[in-house]
């Protein structure tokens, strides 16, 4: 798929070129993986439509969504998003899995779930896929399910529970260098509060939905201080804007590689 680059230099690029330019694993620190979050929003700032984020994005957003999955060691997602979006195998395209292996990655990224309550939807397709590896960090005891997927549960002290603790575990115990967070809005807000987001990929869809109930991309209480963003690039396709931001003060902002 071709995209129109608006910034920094106008040009036509492909999704494959965008993916190959990311180099996310090279930006990891010894302490934790490099973390990017991918979110979608309507033009009036809503992150869900009829309770889901999936219907908001168009073809370009979905192409970039899958391209990002093809570039990372792990995908982190909240239990609510797992449940609502009915997650299955993270990389379904065989060619993408082969390309991952050529780059030194596993065929599929690890699926990482961080939960305080321990209530993980074990009935979703992800746990029925024998090719999937799921790592769960929980503040409450969880019995690993008897499922075709490989599932590892790590208990966290409730007093030390947090995204930063889970990310350190992914880096030290699983060798994860790059993490893609797919939300939802509560998870993104928690990660921003802990200052563990390095980059934000945000698609703004040409839709207006109105209302006061739908969440924004970062839900919950306001952040202690606004998180400043630095635009890395802006792409467009059929009215969809795909924006890549570096989070000010985080790793990689000065090292990001524009397409």
State the predicted function of each range.
Residues 1-259:
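Enzymes that bind and transform nitrogen-containing heteroaromatic metabolites
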């Amino acid at each position: 798929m071709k995209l129109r680059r608006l910034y920094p230099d106008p040009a036509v690029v492909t999704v494959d070129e965008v993916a190959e330019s990311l180099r996310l694993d090279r930006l990891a620190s010894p302490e934790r993986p490099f973390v990017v979050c991918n979110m979608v929003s309507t033009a009036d700032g809503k992150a869900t439509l009829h309770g889901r984020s999936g219907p908001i994005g168009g073809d370009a957003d979905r192409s970039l969504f899958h391209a990002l999955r093809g570039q990372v060691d792990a995908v982190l997602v909240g239990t609510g998003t797992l449940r609502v979006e009915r997650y299955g195998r993270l990389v379904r395209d065989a060619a993408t899995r082969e390309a991952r292996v050529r780059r030194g990655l596993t065929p599929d990224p690890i699926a990482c779930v961080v939960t305080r309550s321990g209530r993980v939807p074990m009935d979703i397709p992800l746990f029925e896929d024998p090719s999937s590896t799921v790592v769960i960090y929980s503040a409450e005891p969880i019995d690993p399910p008897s499922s075709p997927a490989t599932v590892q549960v790590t208990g966290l002290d409730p007093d030390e529970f947090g995204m930063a603790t889970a990310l350190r575990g992914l880096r030290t115990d699983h060798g994860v260098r790059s993490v893609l967070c797919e939300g939802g809005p509560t998870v993104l807000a928690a990660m921003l509060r802990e200052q563990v987001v390095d980059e934000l990929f945000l698609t703004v869809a040409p839709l207006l939905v109105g209302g006061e109930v739908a969440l924004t991309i970062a839900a919950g209480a306001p952040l202690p201080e606004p998180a400043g963003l630095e635009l890395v690039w802006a792409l467009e396709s059929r009215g969809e804007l795909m924006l890549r931001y570096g989070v000010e003060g985080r790793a990689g902002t000065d090292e990001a590689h524009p397409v």
